[in-house]
A protein has these predicted regions:
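Vicinal oxygen chelate
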Residues: 22-26, 29-39, 64-65, 71, 80-155, 160-161, ...
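Residues within well-ordered alpha-helical secondary structure of globular protein domains
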Residues: 13, 50, 104-107, 175-176, ...
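Positively charged n-region of N-terminal signal peptides that target proteins for export
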Residues: 1-6
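Core segments of cupin and vicinal oxygen chelate
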Residues: 26, 32-73, 119-122, 160-207, ...
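A mature extracytoplasmic/lumenal domain signature
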Residues: 40, 52-53, 60, 69, ...
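Short loop/beta submotifs within extracellular cysteine-rich repeat domains
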Residues: 46, 55-56, 71-74, 81-83, ...
Protein backbone atom coordinates (compact mmCIF):
# COMPACT_ATOMS: atom_id res chain seq x y z
CA UNK A 1 0.00 0.00 0.00
CA UNK A 2 1.41 3.40 -0.96
CA UNK A 3 2.08 5.99 1.74
CA UNK A 4 -0.74 8.19 0.38
CA UNK A 5 -3.21 5.33 0.55
CA UNK A 6 -2.03 4.46 4.06
CA UNK A 7 -2.53 8.06 5.15
CA UNK A 8 -6.04 8.19 3.70
CA UNK A 9 -6.90 4.83 5.25
CA UNK A 10 -5.72 5.94 8.69
CA UNK A 11 -7.60 9.22 8.36
CA UNK A 12 -10.80 7.33 7.61
CA UNK A 13 -10.28 5.05 10.60
CA UNK A 14 -9.66 8.00 12.90
CA UNK A 15 -12.80 9.75 11.70
CA UNK A 16 -15.07 6.78 12.40
CA UNK A 17 -15.35 7.31 16.19
CA UNK A 18 -16.24 10.98 15.68
CA UNK A 19 -18.92 10.07 13.17
CA UNK A 20 -20.27 7.38 15.46
CA UNK A 21 -20.56 9.90 18.31
CA UNK A 22 -22.67 12.35 16.30
CA UNK A 23 -26.19 12.05 17.73
CA UNK A 24 -29.01 11.37 15.32
CA UNK A 25 -32.32 13.19 15.51
CA UNK A 26 -35.05 11.22 17.29
CA UNK A 27 -38.58 11.36 15.89
CA UNK A 28 -40.57 14.60 16.09
CA UNK A 29 -44.11 13.35 15.77
CA UNK A 30 -46.45 16.33 16.01
CA UNK A 31 -47.62 19.45 17.80
CA UNK A 32 -47.73 19.27 21.59
CA UNK A 33 -49.12 22.70 22.43
CA UNK A 34 -49.35 26.38 21.59
CA UNK A 35 -48.92 28.93 24.39
CA UNK A 36 -50.49 32.38 24.44
CA UNK A 37 -50.76 35.34 26.77
CA UNK A 38 -54.11 36.74 27.79
CA UNK A 39 -54.91 39.99 29.55
CA UNK A 40 -58.46 38.96 30.50
CA UNK A 41 -58.71 35.74 32.48
CA UNK A 42 -62.50 35.68 32.66
CA UNK A 43 -62.96 36.23 28.94
CA UNK A 44 -60.23 33.69 28.12
CA UNK A 45 -61.95 31.02 30.21
CA UNK A 46 -65.25 31.77 28.50
CA UNK A 47 -63.60 31.40 25.08
CA UNK A 48 -61.36 28.36 25.59
CA UNK A 49 -63.52 26.65 28.20
CA UNK A 50 -67.10 27.45 27.23
CA UNK A 51 -67.01 28.33 23.52
CA UNK A 52 -64.36 25.85 22.36
CA UNK A 53 -65.53 23.34 24.96
CA UNK A 54 -62.22 22.35 26.57
CA UNK A 55 -61.83 21.40 30.24
CA UNK A 56 -59.34 23.57 32.10
CA UNK A 57 -56.40 22.15 34.06
CA UNK A 58 -53.87 24.19 36.03
CA UNK A 59 -50.11 23.65 36.29
CA UNK A 60 -47.09 25.90 36.88
CA UNK A 61 -49.17 29.10 37.05
CA UNK A 62 -50.69 28.35 33.65
CA UNK A 63 -54.02 27.20 32.40
CA UNK A 64 -53.94 24.06 30.27
CA UNK A 65 -56.79 23.11 27.97
CA UNK A 66 -56.32 19.49 26.77
CA UNK A 67 -57.41 18.95 23.17
CA UNK A 68 -56.64 15.24 23.42
CA UNK A 69 -54.27 13.10 25.51
CA UNK A 70 -51.16 14.54 23.81
CA UNK A 71 -52.10 18.05 22.63
CA UNK A 72 -53.21 21.10 24.53
CA UNK A 73 -53.47 24.89 24.63
CA UNK A 74 -51.60 26.88 27.27
CA UNK A 75 -52.79 30.27 28.51
CA UNK A 76 -50.62 32.63 30.57
CA UNK A 77 -52.51 35.38 32.39
CA UNK A 78 -50.73 38.73 32.58
CA UNK A 79 -51.84 42.37 32.52
CA UNK A 80 -48.78 43.31 30.46
CA UNK A 81 -47.41 40.79 27.90
CA UNK A 82 -43.69 41.20 27.07
CA UNK A 83 -44.54 42.67 23.66
CA UNK A 84 -47.71 44.77 23.53
CA UNK A 85 -48.73 43.59 20.05
CA UNK A 86 -47.77 39.91 20.45
CA UNK A 87 -49.68 37.22 22.33
CA UNK A 88 -47.97 34.00 21.17
CA UNK A 89 -45.47 32.88 23.82
CA UNK A 90 -44.30 29.48 22.50
CA UNK A 91 -45.00 26.57 20.20
CA UNK A 92 -44.17 22.99 21.16
CA UNK A 93 -43.64 19.67 19.44
CA UNK A 94 -43.61 16.09 20.71
CA UNK A 95 -40.66 13.71 20.60
CA UNK A 96 -40.15 10.22 21.98
CA UNK A 97 -36.67 11.10 23.29
CA UNK A 98 -36.31 14.66 24.59
CA UNK A 99 -32.86 14.02 26.06
CA UNK A 100 -31.50 12.75 22.76
CA UNK A 101 -33.09 15.62 20.83
CA UNK A 102 -31.53 18.15 23.19
CA UNK A 103 -28.10 16.57 22.61
CA UNK A 104 -28.72 16.50 18.87
CA UNK A 105 -29.45 20.23 18.81
CA UNK A 106 -26.44 20.99 21.00
CA UNK A 107 -24.30 19.09 18.48
CA UNK A 108 -25.61 21.57 15.90
CA UNK A 109 -24.54 24.50 18.08
CA UNK A 110 -28.04 25.27 19.33
CA UNK A 111 -27.88 25.90 23.07
CA UNK A 112 -31.09 25.32 25.01
CA UNK A 113 -32.79 28.47 26.23
CA UNK A 114 -34.60 26.29 28.76
CA UNK A 115 -32.60 23.16 29.77
CA UNK A 116 -34.32 19.79 29.92
CA UNK A 117 -36.53 19.42 32.99
CA UNK A 118 -39.59 17.27 33.58
CA UNK A 119 -39.52 16.04 29.99
CA UNK A 120 -39.33 19.46 28.30
CA UNK A 121 -36.65 21.78 26.97
CA UNK A 122 -36.77 24.94 24.90
CA UNK A 123 -34.66 26.61 22.22
CA UNK A 124 -34.97 29.78 20.15
CA UNK A 125 -35.32 29.57 16.40
CA UNK A 126 -33.35 32.06 14.24
CA UNK A 127 -36.03 34.74 14.69
CA UNK A 128 -36.28 34.33 18.45
CA UNK A 129 -39.44 32.23 18.65
CA UNK A 130 -39.48 29.97 21.70
CA UNK A 131 -39.74 26.36 20.54
CA UNK A 132 -40.31 23.70 23.18
CA UNK A 133 -39.87 19.97 22.73
CA UNK A 134 -41.92 17.68 24.94
CA UNK A 135 -41.27 14.09 25.91
CA UNK A 136 -44.23 11.94 24.88
CA UNK A 137 -46.83 11.53 27.68
CA UNK A 138 -44.75 13.54 30.18
CA UNK A 139 -47.46 16.10 31.02
CA UNK A 140 -49.71 14.08 33.30
CA UNK A 141 -52.66 16.52 33.54
CA UNK A 142 -52.98 16.18 29.76
CA UNK A 143 -52.03 12.52 29.36
CA UNK A 144 -54.65 11.49 31.92
CA UNK A 145 -57.35 13.99 30.89
CA UNK A 146 -60.72 12.65 29.87
CA UNK A 147 -62.14 13.80 26.56
CA UNK A 148 -64.38 16.82 26.92
CA UNK A 149 -67.87 15.98 25.61
CA UNK A 150 -68.44 19.58 24.50
CA UNK A 151 -65.14 20.07 22.63
CA UNK A 152 -65.65 21.45 19.12
CA UNK A 153 -62.52 19.57 17.99
CA UNK A 154 -60.23 16.92 19.45
CA UNK A 155 -57.24 17.45 17.18
CA UNK A 156 -54.72 20.26 16.72
CA UNK A 157 -53.25 20.13 13.21
CA UNK A 158 -51.05 23.19 12.77
CA UNK A 159 -49.54 26.26 14.36
CA UNK A 160 -48.41 29.38 12.54
CA UNK A 161 -46.37 32.46 13.30
CA UNK A 162 -44.84 35.48 11.60
CA UNK A 163 -41.62 34.82 9.68
CA UNK A 164 -39.54 37.62 8.20
CA UNK A 165 -36.50 35.70 6.89
CA UNK A 166 -37.62 32.43 5.34
CA UNK A 167 -34.10 31.28 4.45
CA UNK A 168 -32.89 31.58 8.05
CA UNK A 169 -35.93 29.77 9.36
CA UNK A 170 -35.55 27.00 6.76
CA UNK A 171 -31.98 26.42 7.92
CA UNK A 172 -33.33 25.60 11.37
CA UNK A 173 -36.66 23.95 10.68
CA UNK A 174 -35.80 22.01 7.53
CA UNK A 175 -32.07 21.43 7.51
CA UNK A 176 -31.56 20.75 11.22
CA UNK A 177 -34.94 19.50 12.44
CA UNK A 178 -36.03 17.78 9.23
CA UNK A 179 -39.41 19.44 8.71
CA UNK A 180 -40.77 18.82 5.19
CA UNK A 181 -42.59 21.12 2.73
CA UNK A 182 -46.34 20.45 2.65
CA UNK A 183 -47.95 23.34 0.75
CA UNK A 184 -47.39 27.02 -0.04
CA UNK A 185 -49.52 29.77 -1.51
CA UNK A 186 -50.87 33.29 -1.34
CA UNK A 187 -54.12 35.24 -1.56
CA UNK A 188 -53.70 36.01 -5.27
CA UNK A 189 -52.54 34.14 -8.36
CA UNK A 190 -49.49 36.37 -8.72
CA UNK A 191 -46.77 34.03 -7.49
CA UNK A 192 -46.32 35.85 -4.16
CA UNK A 193 -46.07 33.36 -1.29
CA UNK A 194 -47.68 34.47 1.97
CA UNK A 195 -48.00 31.06 3.59
CA UNK A 196 -45.48 28.21 3.59
CA UNK A 197 -46.34 25.02 5.47
CA UNK A 198 -43.79 22.50 6.77
CA UNK A 199 -44.85 19.15 8.18
CA UNK A 200 -43.12 17.60 11.16
CA UNK A 201 -40.58 14.96 10.09
CA UNK A 202 -42.48 12.01 11.55
CA UNK A 203 -46.15 12.95 11.41
CA UNK A 204 -48.78 15.00 9.62
CA UNK A 205 -49.04 18.16 11.78
CA UNK A 206 -47.45 21.25 10.33
CA UNK A 207 -45.89 24.62 11.05
CA UNK A 208 -47.06 27.53 8.89
CA UNK A 209 -44.75 30.43 8.08
CA UNK A 210 -46.84 33.60 7.92
CA UNK A 211 -44.85 35.74 5.51
CA UNK A 212 -45.04 39.40 4.44
CA UNK A 213 -46.44 40.71 7.72
CA UNK A 214 -44.94 44.14 7.24
CA UNK A 215 -42.69 46.10 9.60
CA UNK A 216 -45.15 46.94 12.41
CA UNK A 217 -48.26 44.74 12.54
CA UNK A 218 -50.85 45.75 15.12
CA UNK A 219 -52.33 43.37 17.69
CA UNK A 220 -55.11 42.14 15.42
CA UNK A 221 -52.76 41.58 12.47
CA UNK A 222 -50.32 39.70 14.69
CA UNK A 223 -53.17 37.66 16.15
CA UNK A 224 -54.31 36.62 12.68
CA UNK A 225 -50.82 35.34 11.89
CA UNK A 226 -49.71 33.91 15.25
CA UNK A 227 -52.38 31.25 15.45
CA UNK A 228 -53.24 27.58 15.83
CA UNK A 229 -55.61 25.30 13.98
CA UNK A 230 -58.11 22.70 15.16
CA UNK A 231 -58.91 19.92 12.72
CA UNK A 232 -62.37 18.55 11.94
CA UNK A 233 -63.67 15.98 9.48
CA UNK A 234 -66.71 18.05 8.52
CA UNK A 235 -67.04 21.77 9.24
CA UNK A 236 -70.76 21.45 9.86
CA UNK A 237 -69.95 19.35 12.94
CA UNK A 238 -67.80 22.18 14.32
CA UNK A 239 -70.53 24.74 13.61
CA UNK A 240 -73.05 22.55 15.43
CA UNK A 241 -70.74 22.10 18.42
CA UNK A 242 -70.02 25.83 18.61
CA UNK A 243 -73.75 26.56 18.53
CA UNK A 244 -74.30 24.05 21.34
CA UNK A 245 -71.59 25.91 23.30
CA UNK A 246 -73.43 29.23 22.74
CA UNK A 247 -70.75 30.71 20.48
CA UNK A 248 -71.57 34.38 19.94
CA UNK A 249 -71.11 36.46 16.81
CA UNK A 250 -71.21 36.00 13.02
CA UNK A 251 -67.85 34.20 12.89
CA UNK A 252 -69.40 31.20 14.65
CA UNK A 253 -71.05 30.11 11.40
CA UNK A 254 -68.88 31.90 8.83
CA UNK A 255 -67.22 29.10 6.87
CA UNK A 256 -65.03 29.77 3.84
CA UNK A 257 -62.89 27.95 1.32
CA UNK A 258 -59.19 28.39 1.93
CA UNK A 259 -56.70 28.86 -0.87
CA UNK A 260 -55.38 25.41 0.01
CA UNK A 261 -58.77 23.93 -0.88
CA UNK A 262 -59.71 23.19 2.73
CA UNK A 263 -62.89 24.50 4.35
CA UNK A 264 -62.14 26.74 7.33
CA UNK A 265 -63.78 28.86 10.02
CA UNK A 266 -61.97 31.48 12.09
CA UNK A 267 -62.63 32.62 15.65
CA UNK A 268 -60.64 35.06 17.78
CA UNK A 269 -59.93 34.87 21.49
CA UNK A 270 -60.26 38.00 23.69
CA UNK A 271 -56.67 39.03 22.86
CA UNK A 272 -57.20 38.68 19.10
CA UNK A 273 -55.41 35.33 18.73
CA UNK A 274 -56.95 33.44 15.81
CA UNK A 275 -58.22 29.90 16.18
CA UNK A 276 -58.65 28.35 12.75
CA UNK A 277 -61.00 25.40 12.41
CA UNK A 278 -60.00 23.46 9.30
CA UNK A 279 -61.14 20.28 7.63
CA UNK A 280 -58.49 17.57 7.56
CA UNK A 281 -58.65 16.99 3.81
CA UNK A 282 -59.11 19.46 0.93
CA UNK A 283 -62.55 19.74 -0.64
CA UNK A 284 -61.11 21.01 -3.92
CA UNK A 285 -57.77 21.44 -5.66
CA UNK A 286 -55.47 23.92 -3.91
CA UNK A 287 -54.11 27.01 -5.54
CA UNK A 288 -50.46 27.75 -6.05
CA UNK A 289 -48.83 24.37 -5.31
CA UNK A 290 -49.83 20.74 -4.83
CA UNK A 291 -49.77 19.08 -1.42
CA UNK A 292 -46.61 17.04 -0.95
CA UNK A 293 -47.48 15.12 2.21
CA UNK A 294 -50.19 13.01 3.78
CA UNK A 295 -53.13 14.90 5.29
CA UNK A 296 -53.88 14.57 9.02
CA UNK A 297 -56.75 12.44 10.28
CA UNK A 298 -58.75 12.50 13.52
CA UNK A 299 -56.79 9.71 15.17
CA UNK A 300 -53.17 10.24 14.14
CA UNK A 301 -52.13 12.66 16.88
CA UNK A 302 -48.94 11.95 18.83
CA UNK A 303 -49.30 8.50 20.34
Amino acid sequence: MSSLRQTLFLACLLSLPALAQQPTRPPITGIAFARFYTTDATAAQKFYGSTLGFERKEADDMWLYPVNHSQWIEVLITPAPPQPNVRMAAVAFTTNDADKLERYLEAHNITPDIPLKDGQFGVRDPEGNLVIFVQQNSVKPVATALASPSAASTRMIHVGFIVTDRAKEDAFWQQILGFRPYWHGGPKDDGVINWASLQVPDGTDWLEYMLNAGPSPNLHQTGVMDHFSLGVSHMNDAVTALAHNHCEGPNCTKTQMGRDGKVQLNLFDPDQTRVEFMEFAPAQEPCCSPFTGKHPTPGDQNN
